[in-house]
């Protein structure tokens, strides 16, 4: 237990940085910044009772009854219309309920996160910013090998 944890009233059982997807930002030369998403290096021990932050946050929002009903709509539509339509599905839900954007990281974790490879569900929270980058810097994505005009090209960055 860390020194900080010894003083805490509550300790949440979270995975370590090696047991989950971890992000790093690099500032090589102003104004260029680089971002790297690392896959988990090891799995949590079989006898550990840990959760990643996305799961902890989602459970807290659910216990507070704050998760919008549109999450079910997003999951149904995603299953029916496919991942390539995720941007449109998410935007449709957000236009019906402003809480979608308020709780976007949790909703992305509970929807898109379930479709990501094992250990990357937390990366779903990056979807909105990845789409923003794809819109603002399409040439950078092309140089990275992500070609095409898909509306969800930014989402492919995290897949």
Report the location of each language-model feature.
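Non-catalytic alpha/beta scaffold blocks inside enzyme catalytic domains
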Residues: 1-94
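Long, low-complexity segments enriched in small/aliphatic residues
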Residues: 88-159
């Amino acid at each position: 237990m860390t020194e900080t944890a010894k003083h805490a009233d509550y300790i949440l059982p979270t995975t370590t940085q090696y047991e989950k997807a971890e992000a790093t930002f690099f500032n090589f030369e102003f104004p260029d910044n680089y971002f790297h998403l690392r896959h988990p290096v090891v799995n949590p021990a079989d006898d550990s009772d840990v959760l990643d932050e996305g799961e902890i946050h989602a459970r807290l929002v659910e216990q507070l009854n704050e998760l919008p009903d549109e999450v079910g709509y997003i999951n149904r539509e995603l299953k029916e219309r496919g991942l390539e339509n995720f941007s449109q599905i998410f935007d449709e839900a957000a236009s019906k309920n402003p809480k979608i954007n308020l709780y976007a990281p949790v909703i992305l974790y509970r929807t898109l996160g379930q479709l990501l490879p094992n250990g990357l569900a937390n990366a779903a929270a990056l979807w909105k910013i990845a789409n923003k980058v794809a819109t603002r810097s399409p040439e950078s994505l092309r140089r990275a090998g992500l070609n095409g005009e898909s509306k969800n090209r930014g989402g492919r960055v995290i897949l």
